Amino acid sequence: MSIYGDYIKSVIRTVPDWPQPGVNFRDITPVLQNSAAFRKLIDSFVHRYQELNLDAIAAIDARGFIIGAPVAYELGCSFVPVRKKGKLPFKTISETYTLEYGASTVELHSDAFREGDRILVMDDLIATGGTMLAAASLIQRSGGQVVETATIIDLPELGGAQKIRDAGHGVFAVCTFTENE
């Protein structure tokens, strides 16, 4: 957890029963609307990764882009979007993963990384871990090395962070939310 974790958590809005009954949606838009909170959020990642000589940030469509791009800028490394299927114009590689009710596919450009590139994978939230694991697989298949996965929010009760750790990847979350928070 970040030194700013409690503060960031206090700014995140919980929207009950959205997008469906029984779901507590963790809304990061109040963080984005508050310049001090957004700066602290980005600084949380920059301070953690500034000495790791990353080659790129691979951020997941779409909310991962919001944090991935400024972190890449601050660290002086490249930014690579991991997109939903059919959104990239050049030759891609893809990875399909299972969801609670079905499957989804993410892609990245086939030339996104060079062999041995050191990559940080970023998204806004880890729930079941499927999207993050699919992105990590794409990176490894393209020759990149996943240094760690990073997120604003971890929902530990859904088990995603543990699945990511079990697959051999580190997980950094600025804050965590239990279901009852």
UniProtKB/Swiss-Prot annotation:
Reaction catalysed by this enzyme: AMP + diphosphate = 5-phospho-alpha-D-ribose 1-diphosphate + adenine
A Pfam family it matches: Pribosyltran
EC number(s) given by UniProt: 2.4.2.7
Keyword RNA-binding on entry: no
Keywords: Cytoplasm, Glycosyltransferase, Purine salvage, Transferase
Source superkingdom: Bacteria
InterPro entries, per database record: Ade_phspho_trans, PRibTrfase_dom, PRTase-like, UPRTase/APRTase
Function, in words: Catalyzes a salvage reaction resulting in the formation of AMP, that is energically less costly than de novo synthesis.
Subunit structure: Homodimer.
Protein name, entry field: Adenine phosphoribosyltransferase
Species of the source: Chromohalobacter salexigens (strain ATCC BAA-138 / DSM 3043 / CIP 106854 / NCIMB 13768 / 1H11)
Gene name, Swiss-Prot/TrEMBL: apt
